[in-house]
């Protein structure tokens, strides 16, 4: 059923009902704080790399290392989460990055922090981040129940947009005023606190026997099922294009802010927060039921709208115009992000959701390949032209995918 065909829902009371559930509230808050710290580290590591090397490629490599594990391990994380207690996976995904942040903060305090330390830390923490969609976000849907799954995921998506706004803002300020030592001390403390909060969560789960040899077959089974559903194929295809060609601009935020617009790390953090601010506003309208459109149209249209915003941003010579356009583009990513999760949960059978969502994580994991491509282009063309080339290519591919799968 399309969103336009659904009966009217009183979204505000449903959201209040969700927040009144202790288990949902805990999962929601843990996701909010942990993801804010992840985005903080992503900005801080990119700015650190660019200030040391003055190379856009070096900055994008460091950022990409945080995201590459989604491509390498995302589908396996989805399969494993059906056989291993998801609460345990979530706890490890908090504790291990907290330990990494503690080590990096200690190295910064003693004056021994090197770029390779940050790069390695990003890869280790990113490996744990690759479990997010198939574990914590699935648990959010399970706790909410099938009758509240759409507002629950919408609320979680709005919150994720807020963390992508707050994280870079905090990152820019922390880097400018506290340095790497203060930034990583903050992220370590928050992630240890989140792990403590999740420890007492009661989350019953029926698990299958873990058979590592079976995992490739599970993934193949998920892909075989996806080929029979044009909507799931659309989610996979547009997710790949959007992450590889649109969200790759995130790796160029430090070169754009510091190099192209010649602003401070704090204002670079504000530029990074522009799109998430728009996504937060747009997601709130969706969560409260004010925007009700066909889910596929919202998903594809939101992606295309954001790519148009990137093209305009790349052509802008004004920092504040770029900020405003990226903010508007965030309304597009709100539709894309909300419907990405909602379409997977409504189109996939319950026994295959983790596997199919694990494949979504792999699709998201193509983002760092785009980040690396954008970095290489930036070294030759400059950050503005790199964003322009990636945005235009992504827009063409999105339109082509939508037209092709509409005929199926």
Language model features by range: what are they?
Residues 3-12, 199-224:
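Flexible cytoplasmic inter-helical loops of multi-pass small-molecule transporters
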Residues 141-149, 346-353:
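Paired intracellular helix-loop junctions of major facilitator superfamily
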Residues 27, 113-120, 235, 320-326:
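Short hydrophobic/alpha-helical segments at membrane-entry points of transmembrane helices
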Residues 10-69, 228-275:
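Helix-loop boundary and gating motifs at the non-cytosolic
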Residues 115-126, 151-205, 249, 271-273, ...:
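Hydrophobic alpha-helical transmembrane segments
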Residues 124-136, 329-340:
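Core transmembrane helices of Major Facilitator Superfamily
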């Amino acid at each position: 059923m399309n969103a336009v065909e659904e009966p009217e829902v009183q979204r505000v009371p449903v959201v209040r009902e969700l927040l009144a559930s202790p288990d949902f509230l805990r999962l929601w808050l843990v996701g909010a704080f942990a993801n804010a710290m992840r985005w903080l580290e992503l900005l801080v590591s990119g700015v650190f790399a660019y200030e040391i090397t003055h190379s856009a490629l070096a900055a994008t490599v460091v950022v990409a290392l945080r995201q590459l594990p989604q491509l390498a391990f995302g589908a396996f994380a989805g399969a494993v989460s059906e056989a291993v207690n998801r609460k345990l996976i979530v706890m490890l995904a908090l504790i291990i990055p907290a330990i990494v942040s503690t080590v990096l903060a200690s190295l910064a305090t003693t004056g021994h922090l090197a770029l390779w330390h940050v790069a390695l830390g990003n890869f280790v923490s990113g490996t744990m981040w690759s479990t997010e969609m198939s574990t914590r976000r699935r648990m959010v849907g399970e706790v909410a129940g099938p009758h509240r799954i759409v507002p629950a995921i919408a609320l979680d998506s709005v919150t994720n947009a807020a963390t992508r706004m707050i994280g870079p803002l905090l990152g820019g300020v922390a880097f400018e005023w506290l340095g790497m030592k203060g930034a990583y001390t903050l992220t370590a403390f928050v992630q240890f606190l989140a792990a403590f909060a999740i420890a007492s969560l009661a989350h019953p789960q029926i698990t299958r026997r873990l058979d590592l040899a079976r995992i490739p077959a599970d993934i193949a089974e998920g892909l075989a099922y996806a080929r029979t559903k044009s909507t799931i194929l659309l989610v996979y295809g547009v997710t790949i294009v959007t992450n590889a060609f649109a969200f790759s601009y995130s790796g160029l935020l430090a070169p754009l802010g510091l190099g192209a617009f010649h602003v401070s790390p704090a204002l670079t953090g504000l530029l990074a927060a522009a799109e998430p601010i728009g996504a937060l506003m747009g997601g709130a309208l969706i969560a409260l039921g004010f925007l009700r459109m066909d889910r596929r149209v919202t998903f594809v249209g939101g992606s295309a709208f954001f790519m148009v915003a990137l093209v305009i941003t790349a052509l802008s010579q004004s920092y504040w115009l770029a900020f405003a356009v990226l903010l508007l583009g965030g309304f597009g990513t709100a539709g894309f992000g909300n419907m990405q999760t909602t379409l997977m949960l409504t189109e996939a059978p319950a026994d295959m959701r983790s596997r199919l969502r694990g494949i979504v994580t792999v699709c998201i994991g193509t983002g760092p390949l785009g980040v690396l491509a954008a970095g290489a282009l930036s070294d030759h063309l400059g950050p503005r032209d790199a964003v322009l080339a990636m945005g235009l290519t992504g827009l063409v591919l999105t339109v082509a995918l939508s037209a092709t799968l509409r005929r199926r």
